[in-house]
UniProtKB/Swiss-Prot annotation:
Motif 'KMSKS' region per record, residues: 267-271
Organism: Heliobacterium modesticaldum (strain ATCC 51547 / Ice1)
GO cellular component: cytosol
Identification of the protein by name: Cysteine--tRNA ligase
Motif extent ('HIGH' region): 31-41
């Protein structure tokens, strides 16, 4: 069976054929760095990390680009609220993102481009759109002319007549069309700005991803991913400006979108105030459990957040780890004592082992069905537990089969980014974070009481251990020197 993926652009499953045999170019929209990520933000991180892992597992070289939007209206607004420089605040939350991603065992992308480092590419792309008549300048702003792109709406299925209010639309009565969107925004006092042919300003939201994906993956690449909330207007506008600029269509061959995480059937979002930061959830559940929880549902299906489902994921992960441990213990034992094994038991385990490998591949080849893939691991674990129950003597053939089963557990779980060894490293990281937060709290209390000697002793002692405490208007934070 060949890999088939659901393509939002065609609204059907298609056989996956990359532009270049053996190589996949993938761009995924990353976070806007103005706050800690919430569970809804974490889902695409885990989903596309898993997709990348599987593509590499089956032999592809994957060039994975995930950006950081470090210039945006939300960043500027939040920075004003807390009295911090927007560029510095965005950089701080980039570092916090890396910590959260590590807790979920999300590997770094091949490249993590930042908007602030790609102004030349963004300005050049806007210039081409203006030259081709797809964009126009208006009092220091530059807008994309939606009617100039005849295929507008092909991703979301919306026509110009059907477009509704509620998207990120700039209100400007002078625009040629109400839905024309900003490529460049003229500078405002106190906001970050860059020089351009249209005066000082900063880029609009959509052009940023178009410029960065083009720089690192070219005019046409294989996979563009993100949450379903980005289909319109963000990804629709990306297609319009990219294809209008380059004349190449499609910009991305396959568009993949993960489903929402909901709370009481409403999308989890910062704007609705119904979100839980990943940091909050990590205080109750380890990162590997959260990852397991997110992969227990097909990536395109919604997940309604519920602690009981996280608890079920924790128990499920522990069952797999217990099975792995029992196999290890059996292989470590001499295996010479015990009654003779009932006839057909080894053959049954071997049959399940082969079925698990085949079923896992078929599940992942069917639009990355991680929920079904996990069920293959559970089926194998159940049969392995039955095989080991009863303390029967292990023949050399039994031991060889158990070794193969153990290797398959590790291999397939690894494809999903799940560590069956117990997540010791993640546990250690959580312990360190907890201890550091405790020490910072004690130091803050000492400073409040003007006990400078204790506060300085904590700071200096940590410095000797290679840990630096930084005091900021938002409180103390720590980092490795």
């Amino acid at each position: 069976m060949s890999l088939r993926v659901y393509n939002t652009l065609s609204r059907e499953k298609e056989t996956f054929v990359p532009h270049k045999a053996g190589r996949v170019g993938m761009y995924v929209c990353g976070p806007t760095t103005y706050d800690y990520i919430h569970l809804g933000n974490a889902r695409p991180l885990v989903v596309f990390d898993t997709i990348r892992r599987y593509l590499e597992h089956v032999g592809y070289e994957v060039v994975y680009i995930q950006n950081f939007t470090d210039i945006d209206d939300k960043i500027i607004h939040r920075a004003k609220e807390i009295g911090e420089d927007p560029i510095a605040m965005a950089a701080r939350f980039v570092e916090e993102y890396y910590r959260d991603a590590k807790a979920l065992n999300v590997r770094p992308a091949t490249i993590h481009p930042k908007v602030s480092a790609h102004m030349a590419e963004i300005i050049a792309m806007i210039g081409v759109l203006v030259e081709k008549g797809h964009a126009y300048e208006l009092g220091g702003d530059v807008y994309f002319s939606i009617p100039s792109f005849k295929d507008y709406g092909k991703l979301s299925g919306r026509s110009l007549e059907d477009l509704q209010a509620g998207a990120r639309v700039d209100v400007n009565e002078r625009k040629r069309h109400p839905m024309d969107f900003a490529l460049w925004k003229g500078a405002k006092p106190g906001e970050p700005s860059w020089d351009s042919p249209w005066g000082k300003g900063r880029p609009g939201w959509h052009i940023e991803c178009s410029a960065m994906s083009r720089k690192y993956l070219g005019d046409a690449f294989d996979i563009h991913g993100g949450g379903q909330d980005l289909i319109f207007p963000h990804h629709e506008n990306e297609i319009a400006q990219s294809e209008a600029c380059t004349g190449t269509s499609p910009m991305a061959r396959y568009w993949l979108h993960n489903g929402f995480i909901t709370v009481n059937q409403e999308k989890m979002s910062k704007s609705l105030g119904n979100f839980f930061t990943l940091r909050e959830i990590l205080k109750r559940f380890p990162g590997d459990v959260i990852r397991f929880y997110l992969l227990s549902t097909h990536y395109r299906s919604p997940i309604d957040f519920d602690d009981s489902k996280l608890e079920a994921a924790q128990k499920g992960l522990q069952r797999l780890r217990t099975s792995r441990r029992l196999i290890e213990e059996a292989l470590a034992a001499s295996g010479k004592e015990g009654a003779e094994r009932p006839a057909g038991q080894r053959e049954k385990l071997e049959e399940q082992w082969l079925a698990a490998k085949k079923g896992f591949r078929e599940a992942m080849d069917d639009d990355f069905n991680t929920a079904l893939a996990l069920s293959m691991l559970f089926d194998l674990a159940r049969e392995a537990n039955t095989f080991l129950h009863g303390g029967f003597a292990l023949t050399p053939e039994d031991r060889q089969l158990l070794l193969q089963v153990a290797e398959t557990f590790e291999e397939l779980a690894g494809v999903l980014g799940i560590d069956l060894a117990g997540g010791a490293a993640a546990a250690d990281d959580n312990t360190v974070d907890g201890l550091m937060n405790l020490l910072i709290g004690i130091r803050a209390e000492a400073r409040k009481k003007k006990d400078w000697a204790t506060a300085d002793r904590i700071r200096d002692g940590l410095k000797e251990l290679g840990i630096v405490i930084e005091d900021t208007p938002q409180g103390a934070r720590w980092k490795k020197a």
